[in-house]
Structure formats: C-alpha cells, structure tokens
Amino acid sequence: MFTPALIKQFQWLFKRRVKRVRACPSPECGHDPTIRQRLWRPTPSVRLQGSPFCFPECLERELLRRLQHTSTAPRREQVNSCRVPLGLMMLSRGELTSGQLQQALELQKKTGTGRIGEWLQQLGYARDVTVAAALASQWSCPVVKSVPSGVGSCTIPFYLLKTFCMAPVHFSSDRRMLHMAFADKIEHRALFAIEQMMDCKTEPCLTTRAQIEGALLRMEEQNSGSEKLFEGISDPEERTRIISSYISTMRATEIRVASCGELLWARITGNELCENLLFSRIAGRVLQFVSKKLPEPSLS
C-alpha cells in the first residue's frame, strides 16, 4: 500500500505545472497544463513551418501574423544585372548577324511585346534549342534537351507550375535536391517557395518552351486535383480562416506557407492526405504561361 507521504508526493507531481516541456513556442500561449491534463486531455497541436503550435488559438494567431507580414512585404524579383543581353551573346557566338538582331529589336520595340529570343524564332533567325542554350549561358545554368515523362507524379501545385512556366526534371532523394526546368527565364521566387514548402534544395536549368508545354500537358492529364485555388482573396484574416478550416477538417498535423509573387501557397498535411491551397490576389488572374503567338513581323 502507498504511504500517506508517497500519496502526497504523487498528488504534488500531478498538479505540478510543466512549463519546461511545453512545446508551443507562442509567447501568448495560455495552455500550461499539469502532467495529468497532458496525459488525459492533451491540447491539439499542429506544426507550422516545423514548429508545433496549439490548435486552434496559437496556430491561428501565428499564421495570421505571418500572413500579415507577407501581405506588406515588398515583392522583389531577383534580377541578374551582370547578364549579357541575349541578342549580343548570340551575335558574339556567330549565331545571327547584326542585321537580324537589329530587325528583331525593332519589331520588339514597335509592338511592345515579346522577348528578343521569341522574335528571333518568329523571324526564323534562330531555333528554340539555340535560344535555350544561349539563355542557359546567360543565367549560368545547365540546359536540358527534354523533360522526362515521369513528372506527372510531382506534388507541386499544377497552377503554380503553369503560372511560372516551369516543370520538375529530377529529384535526388539522397541529397534532397530538386532540379526544375524553365523556359524564357528562371523564377527564383518560385524556387525559394518550393524549397520552403518541400523542405529541399533546388537547382534551375533551362529548356525550350515546347518541352515545358509538353511536360505540363502530361501533368494536366495526370493531375489528381489535390489543390484548391481561391481567387480575389487578399485579406490575411480571411485566408487564415480558410486555412484553419481545412486543418480542422483534415485533422492535419502540419502546415507550411510561402509567398510566391502574387500567390500565397499553403500546404496542409494530414495522416493520409495532403492538400495544396493557392490564394491569388486578383480574381480571374491571367496566367503567365500561354502558347505565345507574336504579331506578324512587319516593318512597314
């Protein structure tokens, strides 16, 4: 039998507050349970960017704080100012003449649309593979001739891939390195978002627009639909409510969020399901990725 002294010690232990083992990092967390409460009535916990928060109060508060910071942070796209202009690079390589370059530049200026590489292809002065190789040299990255057909199993939201005209090429599980192919230019903001959400490193490469189009068409056919797009929702509080609702419905254990240009990407993971939520500031937002048809070249 337990002695009165031992019973008293057990009573003290079960009533004791356990601040040292409280996992929630929120400074405003009101949950400071005793050991008994932790054993019989544990507080639900969801990991946000790897840190466990009490759900819903602490997580919603921290999520709202992060979304408010994201909505006010300046949106800057990384630009390599040291890059040699594409036309001059191709001219120095002997891949076109100065007259051909001048004609393409005049058309670009006159129409106010299209990239110089697109105009060179439109005029028949360069092939897509030649332009892709020059772009790869310009961005100091590899060029790939084709995008593997197995990219359909990728878990990156299809809408995000289509928006930034990119496709996954290869993933190394040992190094946790994801190689992403782009057409036209490298979107570093998209790469940074992928690293945050997928917990991996990324390496960019370049390929032709035709290869990206083909890869995205294959992905669209195999798209499982595990993503939701919310257009015209920019209020951080409304976004927080939507995300919290999905967390509760899915009984999620982890959530990650990242800003990517005009898009907010939220990735919610449960025991068996994974859902991607995308929030666009503009309703009916036009995608960057389209099969481009430039105006007919005319200098008259």
What do the predicted segments below correspond to?
Residues E28-L39, C58-E62:
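Cys/His-rich microdomains that often coordinate metals
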Residues G214-E231:
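Short, low-order "capping/linker" segments at domain edges
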Residues G50-T72, L278:
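Short metal-binding segments enriched for Cys and/or His
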Residues W12, W40-R41, T72-S81, Q102-K110:
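Short, recurring structural edge motifs at helix starts
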Residues V21-C29, C54:
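Short cysteine-rich clusters marking metal-coordination/redox-active sites
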Residues P4-Q9, K15-R17, L123-Q196, I233-L263, ...:
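Polyanionic, low-complexity intrinsically disordered segments
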Residues L6-A23, P44-L48:
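Short, flexible, mixed-charge glycine/proline-rich loop motifs
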Residues R36-S51:
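Short linker/helix segments within small regulatory modules
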